[in-house]
Every structure is written in structure tokens, then in C-alpha cells.
Amino acid sequence: MSDIIAYKLNGEIVDTQSIAGRESSAEPIYFDNSKEALHVIRHSCAHLMAQAIKSLYPKAKFFVGPNVEDGFYYDFRVDDEGTKLGESDLAAIEDKMKELAEKKFDIVKTCSTKANMSEKFKNDDLKQEVLKRIPDGEVSSYAQGDFEDLCRGPHLPNTKFLKFFKLTRVAGAYLGGDESREMLTRIYGTAYADKESLKEHIRIIEEAKKRDHRKLGVEMKLFTFDEEVGGGLPIWLPNGGRLRSKLEQLLYKAHRDRGYEPVRGPELLKADVWRRSGHYANYKENMYFTTIDETEYGIKPMNCVGHIKVYQSDIRSYRDLPLKFFEYGVVHRHEKSGVLHGLFRVREFAQDDSHIFCMPSQIKENILEILKFAGTIMENFGFHYEMEISTKPAKAIGGDEIWDTATKALKEALDENGFKYGIDEGGGAFYGPKIDIKITDALKRKWQCGTIQVDFNLPERFDLGYIDANNERQRPVMLHRALLGSFERFIGILLEHTAGELPFFIAPTQVVIVPISDAHLDYAKEISRELRKINVDSEIASKNESLNKRIRTAEKQRVPMIVVLGDNEVANKSVALRDRQARTQSDMSLAEFVNLTKEKLSEVHF
């Protein structure tokens, strides 16, 4: 049997240093790759990394080193001279970590008052920063060998368990996430209980680098960023514009088929309306504001208020409900520069946003309809997905009774139809609980995309109503819903999921036509016109370059189909087709090729 490295007591992980005779009422956590075990292993590995850095750079001072998904990081200052570490320094730190782990240091926990800890670390300004953020009361630290750091734990009992780890990258991070403070060095890493799991994780990291959507975006000429424009503000190039347009058109038809009405709200609204909605009090730090004619305005971070105003534009009857409004709404949210990341974290993005206004009795049926809609989309793109209910956060509007009712409605809709789901306590929006739809990509990474939120609060705040069958005024329920989440993020995920080999139906350029010489150019143009008639985007690669180079360029841009034209093809009205996704080469008539592309377009059913 594996060694016991910690315990689970009342739902919390408690290390062996803290269990203090309560073992009989706790569940043991063994040294393996379970979620709980990895939490402990990785937390201790972060401390081992810090110990190694301190050994190599004696002036180093450390801020915080928490676990993150699939690993850990530590923020620190190398010295007071501003020395920075890079990727080339990671190997030496790893070697020192292995050397220290083999010394088999016991990991010892000490508890004391905040004042005593402050005195103990009085010459360490970063420790003082940590202590400022800790509530008064007992404070703990953990020591191994000559290294000690403030920490809540939990930790391994000994460094001997730490054998299989990898430092993955170096980044910068502002102290406490505050852009006005100094930039610290941040090193990320991961750890496992066995060599095979670590090896697989490293393989996935290397594969993810090849699939990085930022790299693919350049190669496929989809989007760019420009510092003169500003960070987190993507610029869509013609190829990216075509990709987005195809996705938008498919979703537009799918929404209309399901009874949704297209609407559009303004991007700039008076601050008073954001006060009424609760955004001003609960979401202001994520918004951008400006003053016009001495009146404060806020740029919308969400589309819900605009859709509420559409609802309020007319008297509503129970016969009108449910009312389904949708919009490809452009929103702006403030993201700190340090977390901006390609299309995944941006400051401007477009949501496939919808708001459904319904009677309370219609909540379940509408949630189920949304879930089926979302499932259809994810399956068409080859994603597996799961669901999670997120409950009331610490910062929220509305009483517990309203939140309990809304959360219960979500659970019942899932339970009654056999959907499995997890619970994310405190992860809801400030105005209501939600179902998050999380997809799994080809590298087994999970991404939160779609969301469904039940909201009793905003209808109350804006005094929304409808006339029921008894001619009495009632309050509708508002369902907030996005299926992709945002076009930007979803496209980034899809690029990495497919390694840029996008499905034919949304590929920016679906066919590249390569005439061997100018004598074949007229036929290439004829084929392009035929494809245009059936909404297939093609390009003619007629540059003064070698045939092989033109084909390689099309392959680099991940174009699904490449057609090569020579004398035989012109004479026979045929094409020599290279189907990159089917990995086949074949000859066929032009009519057969046009029919093939029609079939490819019809493969998607939203």
C-alpha cells in the first residue's frame, strides 16, 4: 500500500503535521495521482522550488506560491539588483531541487501569532506583504532544512516524495496583481507521483506549444495585435473575418430556427443604469467609464441591460412568453495586462449572447432546450462536454431565498433529465447561479465556454412585468445564456483543439486552386466562380513561385482542399484534388468536385 501523505477531514485536506490524533475520523490520502494527493504534492514541490532558488540565489525573497490547475507557481524577487531569470535558468533550479529532495528533509509546521511571525520575518519585505493579507490570529509556517516560508499548507511529511517534477516556464507578475507595484519573477511547474504521468504531461505541454492559437493565428493569417492600438484588442484579418462570419451565419440560422429574435443594444450606457442593475457596485472594477456632457457613462461589459430595455419597450402578455432575444454583442472588460493571452483573455470580445424572458413555470423547459442546443453545437465541433452548477458568490445581489429558488431550478432541470454535473460553490455571477458548460479538447484540457444563468434579481430591479391569464401583473424570470461564451475565446480553443485543421464548413479558405502555369489560369478562375455560387471560399495561388512552394503555403495555412490544374485537367474539365483532412489524392470531374464540396458544407447541423 502507498504511503499516507495527508488526510481528508470534513471535506478539507489536512496534512500529517496537523491531524493531531484525529486520524480515526479522517479518510487517508495516499501517495498517488488522485486530485487530493496531487494538491499536496504540488504545494510541497512549490516550496522545494523556492528552497532551491534560495540556495542558488541567497538574496531571493518570496511572495506567494499557490497551486494552479495542473501545477503550481511561485512569485519572488531574485535580489535587490533587479536580476531576472529566464527559461535557460530552469534546468539548474531543477537540478538543485533534485539534490535537496534526496536529502529527505522532514517538513515541519510551526504555528504562532501574527506578531511573532512578523518579528521572525522582519527583514523580509515580501513576507510583510503576505502578513498584511492574513487575518489576525494564528499563523503557520513550514520549514524544510534551512528554508522556511509562511503557508497554510497542506504539505507532504518529507521531501523524499518529490521525485517527478518539471519546471515549465518563467513569467512576470505584479506584486499582489497590482499593476502599480513592482514586477516579480514567476516560475511555473508541475509534479506527479510517478514518472509516466509526468512524461505524459510534458508531452502534452510540447504538443500545446505546437498548437498555440497565437502561433496558428500568424501562420493562418487570422488575427493580429498591435501595441499602438492597445493590449487585449484583437484585429481580425480577412481570413479571420471569414472564419468569424461563417460561424456567425451558422449560429444566426440556428437561433432563428429556435424562435430567437435578433436585437441590438448600445455599447455605451449611462452609469445610472449600471447602478440600477448592480454592476456599478459589484462589477465596476471590470468596466470602463467616461464622462460626456458632465454625465458618467459606462461601456457595457455584458448585454443584459440592453436586452432588458428591449423587453421594456412594449407591454408583455403571458402569451408572448418566452421571449428570446439574441445578439452578437461586443463587450469590454478590464483585464490586467499581465493576464492578457491571445484570444483567450482580451479586453474586447463578442458574445453569442441571449436573454430569455419567461414565466417561472417555463424555466425548466427553456433550460433543457438551451442544453440541447449547446450539445448540438459542441458535438458538431467534436468536443466532449460536462456541466457544473455555480452557486452564490460572496459579492452578490438578492437575498438567499431568491438564490436558493434559482439554484434549485437549475438542479431540478438537470436531475430530472439525467444530466451529471459538479458543483462550484461560490462561482455564480453576482446576479444569479449558473450552469457552466465545460468542454474537453484534444489535449484533455477543460475549457469553460457556454453558460446558463437563472436571474430573479434583475427583473426585480428593473420592475419587469407581464400580464397573466387573470389580467394581473406578474414578474418574469430572466435566463442569461451564451453557447460559445465569446467568439474570440471559442475560436482560440477550436484552433488548438484542431491544431488549425478547422472543419471544412468554417475554414476561412476552403479550397486553394493551384494552376501549374498561366495557361491554366482561366480554368482556375472558372472553378473559383463555380465554388463561389455555392458559398465555398477559394483562392487561386498564381504567384510567380514554384508549384511546390505554392502547395506548401496552402498546407501551412491549413486549407482543407488543394486543387492542382495542368493540361489534362483543363482538357478534361477535371481536377487533381488533395484532400488534406481525408489525407487522400484523387482525380475527378469538376461537377463531382463541386458536389463533394456541397456535401462537406452540409455535414454540419446546428
UniProtKB/Swiss-Prot annotation:
- Record's keyword annotation contains Iron: no
Pfam families referenced in this protein's UniProt entry, alphabetically = HGTP_anticodon (PF03129), tRNA-synt_2b (PF00587), tRNA_SAD (PF07973)
What are its GO cellular component terms? cytosol
Task: Kindly list the places in or outside the cell where this protein is found, as annotated in its UniProt entry.
Answer: Cytoplasm
InterPro entries, alphabetized:
aa-tRNA-synt_IIb (IPR002314), aa-tRNA-synth_II (IPR006195), aa-tRNA-synth_II/BPL/LPL (IPR045864), Anticodon-bd (IPR004154), Anticodon-bd_dom_sf (IPR036621), Thr-tRNA-ligase_IIa (IPR002320), Thr/Ala-tRNA-synth_IIc_edit (IPR018163), ThrRS_anticodon (IPR047246)
- Residues given in the record as Zn(2+) binding sites: C304, H355, H480
Q: Which cofactors are named for this entry? A: Zn(2+)
Please give the residue ranges the record annotates as the region Catalytic: 212-503
Quaternary assembly: Homodimer.
Name of the protein in question? Threonine--tRNA ligase
